[in-house]
Amino acid sequence: MEEKIEMSMLLDFYGILLTDKQKSIMNLYCNEDFSLAEISEHTKTSRQAVHDIIKRCGKLLKSYEEKLKLMGKHIEKIKAKKNMLNKLDYLKENCKEEELQKLIEELKNELNNSLGG
């Protein structure tokens, strides 16, 4: 996983545990794709301080994930739901009974809704 994408996801899960300034700088860096110089100018902080905050927060976010594993669990749930959808597709294609096909379609819809679409 690309470093910024991973940091962005970790920020989504654990950003609330950071200070407002840390969260703001990490958001600008990860989600808004600001350079260190742009963040420095925007926050009126030295470039070196911005760099240090990003490195420190990155380590902090990774340590939260190592301990709590929220992002890992979330990714595993998504994979499991997609796997279930694939199995339901297989069953629907190979099933001849109309009532069972309807039930499979309802289950697929519920899983799709829980995946956000």
From Swiss-Prot:
General function of this protein: Might take part in the signal recognition particle (SRP) pathway. This is inferred from the conservation of its genetic proximity to ftsY/ffh. May be a regulatory protein.
Record-linked Gene3D superfamilies: Winged helix-like DNA-binding domain superfamily/Winged helix DNA-binding domain
Cross-referenced Pfam families: UPF0122
NCBIfam families for this protein: PRK00118.2-2, YlxM
Signal peptide: none
Protein name according to UniProt: UPF0122 protein CTC_01247
Organism name: Clostridium tetani (strain Massachusetts / E88)
Coiled-coil stretches: none
PANTHER family for this protein: UPF0122 PROTEIN CBO2450/CLC_2298, UPF0122 PROTEIN YLXM
Family to which this protein belongs: Belongs to the UPF0122 family.
